[in-house]
Amino acid sequence: MAETSLPELGGEDKATPCPSILELEELLRAGKSSCSRVDEVWPNLFIGDAATANNRFELWKLGITHVLNAAHKGLYCQGGPDFYGSSVSYLGVPAHDLPDFDISAYFSSAADFIHRALNTPGAKVLVHCVVGVSRSATLVLAYLMLHQRLSLRQAVITVRQHRWVFPNRGFLHQLCRLDQQLRGAGQS
């Protein structure tokens, strides 16, 4: 993925309200209907599963230099600073894939980690959870909103062009709140 171009979105502006959860779920059902263990969803930014994250040789082949584990200390996620050693920068987010889990508490720190990494020449970032569909996707969507200034709708469409993702409804509500906060801040 050399260049990323945003899809035509019909002149969406700051006044456009956040899509409803049902509209977001429809957007999530559209686009790519399958995913690999790991997919590049933005230049040098990958979403993947725990099996990929647990395979240091695969990470080396992909050129991954930074790992954000959205299921830190989870059952299937053995990664951590000791696992990767000094060759990979690591951030662990102990998120649970439950609608009532407050993943928004990690939006800023996760987005900042991704942003700093992608501003490092030659860096590639893997964001993963167990399956690479809900927690990791939520944090990548938050990054695209916070640092790439995409609306939630634009971020979902962009990621869905490259990977099947489906954050749980609680995470979608939290992303909607972030979208509304960012749009409100942009109107001041």
UniProtKB/Swiss-Prot annotation:
Which residues are responsible for catalysis?
C129 (phosphocysteine intermediate)
Compartments it resides in: Cytoplasm
Q: Which InterPro entries does UniProt cross-reference here? A: Atypical_DUSP_subfamA, Dual-sp_phosphatase_cat-dom, Prot-tyrosine_phosphatase-like, Tyr_Pase_AS, Tyr_Pase_cat, Tyr_Pase_dom, TYR_PHOSPHATASE_DUAL_dom
- Molecular function GO terms recorded: phosphatase activity; protein serine/threonine phosphatase activity; protein tyrosine phosphatase activity; protein tyrosine/serine/threonine phosphatase activity
**How is this protein activated or inhibited?**
Inhibited by vanadate.
Please tell me in which tissues this protein is expressed. Answer: Skeletal muscle specific.
Protein name per the record: Dual specificity protein phosphatase 13A
Query: What organism is recorded for this protein?
Result: Homo sapiens (Human)
